[in-house]
């Protein structure tokens, strides 16, 4: 009994794993291996005496605690031992077979479960702290495998799972450092029948969809295993043939998708997409995206067998069976939610193979006999939030720079050149070196903007025509191309003699720089396309494509900034399958178009029909609509570029060009606002509201995500903020301002807490504007007083004669008529005002894109390489 008391006094009353981790050997620096070896010997002898005691002498739990104390001290010594093969302390542990003896004693004791828990902690401490490759020795890995096997056969308590998964992750880390461990822990390459058919990888599968740290550790460990499978094909074959890893991932996606809310409570009409970082408060969406991101990472690094099986299961088990039916629902709210989810999923994918699966699903699969992509295009023409969300998804798809998508939407209808006269085919490849199209775009800026625009020099006449305004702008901008820049963008610099228009001239130069960057990036990612789409003869093109192996390269998906390094990176099995069904068969059937959409196809026809109503559309509909058209303008393919940006091309009767539609819009908005008093003040306040909306949107995001207070009125009016927000560009609104707006509050049949409130709304209502006139806002609301603060009431001067009095009466009647029109048509006036503001900026952007398309072929090829 005296020995037991002595040993018990050495152990803490309640040792914990945290205490073990913080415990260090308090030994002087000069203590040699002999002293450490002596210390290990003392602890092991004490342990043997504890295990040899009768159970009646001391309780089993007390014996377990004392034994684990000594074992942890031995592990601490091993962790401090230098990397030798093996060191004296490790050699002593191996010779004594300490770990196996302790394991066997634990299985025969009355505290088997407690011993399992404590041994798992010991092995976690050993794996995480050991510097030597201790796991390669059978005296260590055999008892560890036996311990893991015994844990796998029973349900683990929750307080034990953390250490258990940590041990499994540590084994995956160690196997990546030493490939020898792959045979021992993953491939069952040992001769012990009691643990045959056992692999560490299979133990991780039940934790793949867990939340919290357990799920993170398990997924990280599996990714390490995937990296090993890419090195050793045996592991890849084992995962595919012997485990249910891939089916669990695919089924998990379907199950998590079914948990997503079926409707979105949209607080404002400026919303059209779900953004990363703003959906973090919704656990269902976070869980699905976590699983999707894990599948994406697995496909990136796993063995090709694992990739193929997982992709097939995701396509058939999730997309075809679940997503397809979700996209054919009858409820508009449900369709809006599913479309927004799909948009978010596509934007979250970074692996090209997984993106190919999603693109194939959109191009090949049908709902009610109609391809899913065609259904999305048809929804664009609706007057609902579904149309806006569908436009957002289309914009995301266009950002992929995918040949098959653009071919299906646009190019297959433009290839026959039925939209232009036969004599105009040569103009498809012409380059607008003299910027005639850019000048035409600028000439379409509404005349009411000329008084406010700062793009003209101060010497400009008071009432210039559209053409003279364009000429003045073109003369004011002198562009220098700095050819000395290597691997950089061409730099544009205004001449120092510009004075009155410096601010907006710099603004236009920024449009040019942004357009150049966007066009160059798009051109780089389209460089591997199989055709140039320049309007050449189809038969010769087909022959050249068949005979030239280089032209067989495909770019089904080059997503999220990926640039092809070789043809093998671009080609894929999906490209071949999608080719048979969607593209590459330019037969007579492909070229027979419906008469109603002759030459353009349903996508461009729907876009143009919606664009024709720009004066009546809401601000946010116009925002995403113009962004989609702008994204189409970035593509360098001559067929599409000439149709959208070439003013000189002659179209067939019945086919309207973008210039004709913009000219019609200009006339419409000018007709609406010609009777509006104080129009210039309304335009100024519309611009200010857009700047204020941007600042409030950013503050709302910060308050939701980081609990940052909304900026004050003074901070909004600061010079730095005003300079940063001076440009109201369509693409900037799209990429930053709208998408950074607050997310809709997700709701189920039973309510979930909504974050969409007045305090977090990114759009200004007519009553809560910080400006005194806050009566002109993109968001529809009460606009009854839109005209009163917007235009000051003119006071009639005193008159002494009848003619003067008659003039005053006529002036008063005209002003009364204008104010009456504004009071009776507040929605029309507001839409027209915001349409003018957007149209002016969009026309500048289109002009810049047109000029950059002409300039880019002049830049040396080495400057265009990444």
Curated annotation (Swiss-Prot):
InterPro entries: FHIP, FHIP_C, FHIP_KELAA_motif. Residues 739-761, 781-814 are annotated as: Disordered. Residues 751-761 have a biased composition (Low complexity). It holds the Pfam family KELAA. It comes from the Eukaryota. Disulfide bonds: none annotated. Belongs to the FHIP family. This is FHIP family protein v1g243165. It comes from Nematostella vectensis.
């Amino acid at each position: 009994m005296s020995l037991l008391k002595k040993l018990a006094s050495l152990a803490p009353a309640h040792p914990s794993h945290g205490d073990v981790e913080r415990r260090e050997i308090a030994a002087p620096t000069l203590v040699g291996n002999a002293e450490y070896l002596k210390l290990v010997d003392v602890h092991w002898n004490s342990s043997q005496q504890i295990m040899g005691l009768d159970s009646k002498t001391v309780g089993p739990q007390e014996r377990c605690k004392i034994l684990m104390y000594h074992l942890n001290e031995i592990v601490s010594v091993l962790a401090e031992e230098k990397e030798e093969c093996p060191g004296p302390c490790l050699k002593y542990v191996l010779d004594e077979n300490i770990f196996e003896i302790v394991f066997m004693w634990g299985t025969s004791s009355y505290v088997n479960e407690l011993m399992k828990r404590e041994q798992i902690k010991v092995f976690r401490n050993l794996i995480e702290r050991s510097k030597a490759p201790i796991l390669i020795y059978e005296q260590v890995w055999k008892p560890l495998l036996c311990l893991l096997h015994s844990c796998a056969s029973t349900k683990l308590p929750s307080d034990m799972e953390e250490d258990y998964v940590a041990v499994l992750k540590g084994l995956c880390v160690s196997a990546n450092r030493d490939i020898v461990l792959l045979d021992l822990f993953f491939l069952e390459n040992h001769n012990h029948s009691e643990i045959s058919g056992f692999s560490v990888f299979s133990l991780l599968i039940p934790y793949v969809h867990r939340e919290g740290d357990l799920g993170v550790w398990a997924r990280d460990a599996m990714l390490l295993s995937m990296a090993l499978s890419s090195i050793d094909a045996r592991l890849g074959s084992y995962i595919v043939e012997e485990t249910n890893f891939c089916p669990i991932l695919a089924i998990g996606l379907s199950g998590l998708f079914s948990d997503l809310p079926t409707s979105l409570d949209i607080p404002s009409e400026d919303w059209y997409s779900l953004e990363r970082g703003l959906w973090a408060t919704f656990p269902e969406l976070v869980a699905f995206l976590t699983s999707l991101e894990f599948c994406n990472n697995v496909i990136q690094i796993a063995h090709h067998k694992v990739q193929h099986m997982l992709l097939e299961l995701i396509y058939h088990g999730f997309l075809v069976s679940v997503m397809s039916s979700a996209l054919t629902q009858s409820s508009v709210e449900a369709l809006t939610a599913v479309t927004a989810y799909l948009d978010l999923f596509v934007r979250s994918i970074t692996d090209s193979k997984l993106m190919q699966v999603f693109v194939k699903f959109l191009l090949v699969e049908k709902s009610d006999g109609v391809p899913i992509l065609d259904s999305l295009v048809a929804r664009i023409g609706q007057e609902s939030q579904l149309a806006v969300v569908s436009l957002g998804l289309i914009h995301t798809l266009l950002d992929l720079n995918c040949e098959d998508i653009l071919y299906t939407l646009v190019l297959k209808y433009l290839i026959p050149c039925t939209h232009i006269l036969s004599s105009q085919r040569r103009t498809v490849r012409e380059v607008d070196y003299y910027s005639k199209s850019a000048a035409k775009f600028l000439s379409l800026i509404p005349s009411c903007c000329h008084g406010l625009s700062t793009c003209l020099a101060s010497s400009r006449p008071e009432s210039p025509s559209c053409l003279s305004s364009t000429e003045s702008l073109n003369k004011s901008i002198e562009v220098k191309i700095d050819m000395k820049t290597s691997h950089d963008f061409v730099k544009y610099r205004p001449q120092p003699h510009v004075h009155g228009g410096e601010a907006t001239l710099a603004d236009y130069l920024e449009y040019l720089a942004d357009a150049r960057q966007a066009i160059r990036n798009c051109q780089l990612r389209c460089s591997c396309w199989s055709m140039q789409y320049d309007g050449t003869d189809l038969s010769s093109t087909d022959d050249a494509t068949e005979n030239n192996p280089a032209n067989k390269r495909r770019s089904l998906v080059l997503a999220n900034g990926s640039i092809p390094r070789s043809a093998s990176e671009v080609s894929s099995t999906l490209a071949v399958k999608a080719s048979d069904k969607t593209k590459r068969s330019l037969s007579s059937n492909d070229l027979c178009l419906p008469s109603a959409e002759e030459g353009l196809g349903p996508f461009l026809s729907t876009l143009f029909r919606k664009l024709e109503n720009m004066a009546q559309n809401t601000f946010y509909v116009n925002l995403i609509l113009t962004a989609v058209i702008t994204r189409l303008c970035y593509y360098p393919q001559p067929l599409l570029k000439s149709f959208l940006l070439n003013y000189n091309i002659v179209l067939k009767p019945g086919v309207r060009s973008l210039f004709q539609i913009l000219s019609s819009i200009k006339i419409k908005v000018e007709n609406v606002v010609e009777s509006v008093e104080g129009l210039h003040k309304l335009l100024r306040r519309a611009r200010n509201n857009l700047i204020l909306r941007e600042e409030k949107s950013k503050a709302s995001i910060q308050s939701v995500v980081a609990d940052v207070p909304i900026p004050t009125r003074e901070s909004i009016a600061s010079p730095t903020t005003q300079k940063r927000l001076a440009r109201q560009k369509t693409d900037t609104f799209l990429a930053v301002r709208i998408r950074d707006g607050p997310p809709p509050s997700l709701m189920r049949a039973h309510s979930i807490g909504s974050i969409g409130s007045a305090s977090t709304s990114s759009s200004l209502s007519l009553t809560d504007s910080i400006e005194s006139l806050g009566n002109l806002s993109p968001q529809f609301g009460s606009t009854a007083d839109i005209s009163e603060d917007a235009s000051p009431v003119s006071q009639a001067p005193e008159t002494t004669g009848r003619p003067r009095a008659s003039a005053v009466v006529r002036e008063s009647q005209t002003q009364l008529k204008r104010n009456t029109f504004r009071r009776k048509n507040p929605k029309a006036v507001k839409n027209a005002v915001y349409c003018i503001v957007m149209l002016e900026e969009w026309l500048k952007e289109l002009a810049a894109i047109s000029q950059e398309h002409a300039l880019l072929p002049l830049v040396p090829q080495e400057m265009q390489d990444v």
